Amino acid sequence: MPAREKIGVVVSNKMQKTVVVAVENRVAHPKYGKIVVKTKKFKAHDEENRCQEGDLVRITETRPLSRTKRWRVAEIIREVKKL
């Protein structure tokens, strides 16, 4: 069974070797049918501390690395401009 993958935006990189990635999911409201954007945050392992806030990244599921960390940064799709 292949590992699950998600694409999201880095919202925090304040921890060492860890980033927080916000993943958006669009679902229809069960009763009214309106499309609602739901956001979920995942902690992901970033071994080289390469990710910056605002980067678009792909994360893959992995074995538990800590109490809350079960994802790993697979690649940086789009980097934010550095000042």
Swiss-Prot record:
GO terms for cellular component: cytosolic small ribosomal subunit. It comes from the Bacteria. One of its GO terms (biological process) is translation. Keywords: Ribonucleoprotein, Ribosomal protein, RNA-binding, rRNA-binding. InterPro entries: NA-bd_OB-fold (IPR012340), Ribosomal_uS17 (IPR000266), Ribosomal_uS17_bact/chlr (IPR019984), Ribosomal_uS17_CS (IPR019979). The keyword RNA-binding applies. One of its GO terms (molecular function) is rRNA binding. It holds the Pfam family Ribosomal_S17. PROSITE patterns: RIBOSOMAL_S17. Belongs to the universal ribosomal protein uS17 family. One of the primary rRNA binding proteins, it binds specifically to the 5'-end of 16S ribosomal RNA. HAMAP family: Ribosomal_uS17_B (MF_01345_B). Part of the 30S ribosomal subunit. This is Small ribosomal subunit protein uS17. It comes from Synechococcus sp. (strain JA-3-3Ab) (Cyanobacteria bacterium Yellowstone A-Prime). The lineage of its organism: Bacteria, Bacillati, Cyanobacteriota, Cyanophyceae, Synechococcales. The gene is rpsQ.
